[in-house]
């Protein structure tokens, strides 16, 4: 079993409520980077667990004008994952300045 699969299973055990439905997807982003994501839409709030830069990142659903936006509800800095119409992007949200720095801008689900 690969390290990535083990990490995803651990994330699910930690993040998902008992009996919650999950959806696992891997996105192919710019520069050829793969981003595995496990969505837990039945959690309250809904969550996404991403494996990026060698770490598991747990994000919660956030208000968005369109699409599904995940971040961390605080005044500090955090990753932000935004999925809209089959595409996604990952950025770093700087809490103090409210600036968004793109990390991966064109992520599409792998077949």
Q: What annotation goes with each model-predicted range?
A:
Residues 21-111:
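Cysteine-centric segments in proteins
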Residues 1-2, 34:
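Low-complexity, intrinsically disordered short peptide segments enriched in small/polar/basic residues
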Residues 15-17:
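N-terminal signal peptide c-region/cleavage motif recognized by signal peptidases
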Residues 2-10:
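Sec-dependent signal peptide recognition
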């Amino acid at each position: 079993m690969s390290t990535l699969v083990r990490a995803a299973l651990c994330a699910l055990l930690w993040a998902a409520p008992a009996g919650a439905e999950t959806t696992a997807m891997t996105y192919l982003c710019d520069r050829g980077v793969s981003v595995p994501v496990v969505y837990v839409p039945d959690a309250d709030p809904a969550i996404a667990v991403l494996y990026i830069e060698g770490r598991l990142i747990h994000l919660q659903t956030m208000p968005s004008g369109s699409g599904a936006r995940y971040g961390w509800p605080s005044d500090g800095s955090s990753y932000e994952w935004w999925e809209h119409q089959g595409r996604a992007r990952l950025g770093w949200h700087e809490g103090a300045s409210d600036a968004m720095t793109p990390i991966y801008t064109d992520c599409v689900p792998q077949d």
